[in-house]
Amino acid sequence: KYAVIYFMAAVYFLDSMLVTRYPSEQLISCIRYTATIFFALWMVEYYDGEKLFHLIAAAQVIFTCLTFAFMLLRPGAVFSQEQGEHDFTGFLRTKNNAASQFSICILLQIAWFRILRAKQMIVSRKYLLSLLAQGIFLVLCNAKGAVLCLIFPLLYVLFGKYKEEPGKRLPLGVIYVTLSVAFLITALTILPLFQPLFSLIGKDATLTGRIPLWRQIIQVMINRHTFTGYGYGMFWRDRQAVAMVHQAFSRNSFMGSMTTGAHNVLLELWMNVGLFGVAAYFTAMIISTIGAERMEWTGYLFSAAYILWFMVFGWTERSMSTYEYQTLFLFIAMGSACNKQRVGPKRRQYVK
């Protein structure tokens, strides 16, 4: 049942090892990525959707407590130190890192609360207080993109009829692929027409310089390694490849020295595993989510909440590093979507 995910992992592994200029580092990167996938699928096999939500909520309570502790120990370090900014970062490196952490976990906790409500169970006070604190932290981050990532999937979590009407569940894979590609095309063609709307939220039509970067990346990838990429996680390690991106920008500008990613999940994948890898990813996403009406509703809720959030997040941010919680959650979501029937090892029973 997970064959399509295994296929994608195999494509990434084989492609990366064949094209990389750094075989030792590439092997480590591929092993880490594969281990993340296997761990995600192991969790899907042994925990149902409700338990997965519970584990994430419990982990986020710990994260919130650690954030408060860090604030007490180093109060001057929890806000951005860059000139002209005073955005909350907690103990993470940037406001966007912190905001994405709070954004996705707020969403998944609210989804868990809906499950508990359906079972007429009361939410523990510690989870409610943790959620409130995370909401305040998210506002302090002043990261509007993370809030936008939260809105659309949150509306579906709260008002969707996925439990009562399984036949009307969303085709998650098709939506993900279609809107992700459509966003890139729109951003590169007609987005400047919407400058007045972006001005209302304090942004510009270049998405803070992302669009010129995307155009240059596309130009680089059309000319070199179009179908194979540079190896998973290796593009930004390759000095020649990075130099080709930088040459379109002033040497003294941020983009002329930036090595922190494409700020778009699909472009980042293209750079690393080429069009073959992107095609394998799209195939895995679409096939794994076919037949959503046959999924256990709590598992579907996890898949829907995370895939919809990750879709919007991936429009303007990078992700899918070899081992990070966003990558782990993605393959838990895809694995849950594959798990249409209860087969294999018996799931552990949820005990409150």
PLM ranges: what are they?
Residues K1-L14, D48-H54, F113-R125, E293, ...:
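Transmembrane signal-anchor hairpin modules in multi-pass inner-membrane enzymes, especially those
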Residues Y2-F13, Y22-E45, L55-A58, C65, ...:
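Aromatic-anchored transmembrane helix interface
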Residues F53-F79, R93-Y162, I287:
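Alpha-helical transmembrane segments of multi-pass inner-membrane proteins
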Residues A69-L73, L140-C141, L158-K203, Q219-N223, ...:
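A membrane-periplasm/extracellular boundary helix in multi-pass inner-membrane enzymes
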Residues H86-F91, R169-L170, L184-Q216, R237-R239, ...:
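Flexible juxtamembrane loops connecting transmembrane helices in multi-pass membrane enzymes
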Residues L107, A111, L154, S303-K352:
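Transmembrane alpha-helices of multi-pass inner-membrane enzymes
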Residues M121-K126, L155, F159-Y162, K168-P171, ...:
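Hydrophobic transmembrane alpha-helices and their immediate junctions
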Residues I201-R215, Q219, N223-V273:
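Long extracytoplasmic/lumenal interhelical loops at the membrane interface
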